[in-house]
């Protein structure tokens, strides 16, 4: 079990009227919010460390509800947002929660790959005055997929192994994994690594949605992350519960198992 302090999202907070005005209570016992705790259309914040929060939202696909993680990082008197909250409605709720619970403006965002759980809501951010960033490849893939497209390219993130400092974080393009364009974000001040969908939670036994994955390259990509951030203390996956560096090896194991599963079947 990793130890991180929770950011209580309010004793009797309400989602904005436009979102349905549903009440929710603070997370008991400092537990990380799960899919069972968050109705679709609402967002929870969880404090990871000084000036760093995860944001957690849910979305229903078919008959199943999934949770999704993003990150909020303080940058002086502003906030940097890592990933949307998976859709316009959720992202409106996210901005409302940030205003309510943190009270600082979100001025910039980074999307870590082109899927809707990372870029869905970019138009909401843009309308709110947030400068939206991602890699050149993510912009290209998002446009090709008909997804929302962040406005600005981090042109230094063009090839596997590229890294750029962006305010209080380091953004690393480790190579193809869950998607060809997935980025990871490291907050050195608190040793928090946001692995996004390149990294799985500990309970995950399947590689999940691999429609755009590169299963052959994924283990090597994880190895690059391990080599670059051996000092990371908290690792946040794209979906599910945070952990430590063990999540990286776990992800490799899951991906390798997925690769051989069709042969066994």
From Swiss-Prot:
Zn(2+) 1 binds at residues 113, 115, 178. One of its GO terms (biological process) is response to antibiotic. Its cofactor is Zn(2+). Zn(2+) 2 binds at residues 117, 197, 239. Residues 1-17 form the signal peptide. GO terms for cellular component: periplasmic space. It catalyses: a beta-lactam + H2O = a substituted beta-amino acid. Keywords: Antibiotic resistance, Hydrolase, Metal-binding, Periplasm, Plasmid, Signal, Zinc. Its EC number is 3.5.2.6. GO terms for molecular function: beta-lactamase activity; zinc ion binding. SUPFAM superfamilies: Metallo-hydrolase/oxidoreductase. It is found in: Periplasm. Belongs to the metallo-beta-lactamase superfamily. Class-B beta-lactamase family. The class B beta-lactamase family has a specific amino-acid numbering system known as BBL, for standard numbering of class B beta-lactamases. A multiple sequence alignment was used to derive a consensus sequence and then the consensus was numbered taking into account insertions and deletions. This allows use of identical numbers, e.g. for active site residues, despite differences in protein length. UniProt always uses natural numbering of residues, hence there appear to be differences in numbering between this entry and some papers. Class B beta-lactamase which confers resistance to the beta-lactam antibiotics, including penicillins, cephalosporins and carbapenems. Acts via hydrolysis of the beta-lactam ring. Has penicillin-, cephalosporin- and carbapenem-hydrolyzing activities. Monomer. This is Metallo-beta-lactamase VIM-7. It comes from Pseudomonas aeruginosa.
